[in-house]
Amino acid sequence: MDYEFLRDVTGQVIVRMSMGHEAIGHWFNEEVKGQLTVLTDVEEAARSVAGSERQWRRVGHEYTLSLDEEEVMVQANQLSFTTDELEEGMSYYDEESLSLCGLDDFLTLVEKYREFVLH
């Protein structure tokens, strides 16, 4: 999972993720937006599910983050899309709507994001 942190002209931190992990970058850009308390909540949740079969979920405005002791899933909160509505020859692109990664990799990303924001 490759990622890059940038600042836009307003100073807002932007996360760019490798292909297949775009939704995770969108989650940081849309749901975190530099609010480190969101990351603290996620880290506390990760500790709370460790060694159990419990799951934790945070529903945001655009994306929902779910985690268990092994994996993190970020999914867009969009309404389900019916492919029957598409014109012939058209397809629906949803690769940026769902991303999965290991919990340890995600927590490393959270740590690196926090460091970038604070420096």
Curated annotation (Swiss-Prot):
InterPro entries: UPF0231. Belongs to the UPF0231 family. It comes from Pectobacterium carotovorum subsp. carotovorum (strain PC1). It comes from the Bacteria. This is UPF0231 protein PC1_3552. Pfam families: UPF0231 (PF06062).
